[in-house]
């Protein structure tokens, strides 16, 4: 509805624009909807919108770093919703989307901006996911409610397997 309204106003008033301007406007106008409707689905769509916008700026570090402030908008909603009902299905879905988005967003923003440090960045992020889950969500009834544990555990195993090959080390200049 928000995107349609923006497009309609742009057509009626013959405003020029780009995908970037449209996406940023959609994100800024969509953020309050999350809080007004108290909707995990709206939050998930917002997070996916931020990730989509960031994907269009891969390589432009000054623009893609805006991923982090845009994503931080969802954190108060997530914390408030967690206090009300920690293990609801909607909140679990939002956690899955946010955790996946954080992994992808880290790769898009930080790994491209700091090319030699991607191994350390991802190892720290995945370890942090696993430890935060162990600290905060240890009473979860199933793995569906623990996306951080799944991403952290599986991600650490995948990263360890990737680092057994030569290409990651050659890409940072290590030739021994």
Segments from the language model and where they lie:
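Alpha-helical multi-pass membrane segments and their bilayer interfacial helix-loop junctions
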Residues: 1-176
């Amino acid at each position: 509805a928000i995107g349609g309204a923006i497009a309609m106003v742009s057509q009626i008033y013959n405003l020029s624009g780009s995908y970037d301007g449209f996406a940023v406007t959609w994100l800024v106008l969509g953020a309050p909807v999350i809080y007004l409707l108290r909707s995990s689905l709206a939050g998930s769509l917002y997070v996916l919108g931020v990730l989509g916008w960031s994907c269009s700026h891969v390589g432009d570090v000054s623009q893609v770093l805006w991923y982090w402030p845009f994503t931080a908008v969802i954190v108060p909603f997530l914390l408030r919703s967690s206090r009300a009902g920690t293990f609801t299905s909607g909140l679990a879905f939002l956690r899955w989307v946010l955790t996946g988005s954080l992994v992808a967003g880290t790769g898009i923003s930080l790994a491209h901006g700091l090319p030699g440090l991607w191994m350390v960045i991802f190892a720290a992020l995945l370890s942090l996911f696993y430890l935060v889950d162990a600290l905060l969500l240890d009473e979860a009834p199933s793995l569906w409610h623990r996306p951080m544990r799944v991403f952290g555990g599986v991600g650490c195993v995948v990263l360890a397997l990737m680092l057994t090959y030569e290409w990651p080390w050659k890409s940072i200049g290590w030739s021994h």
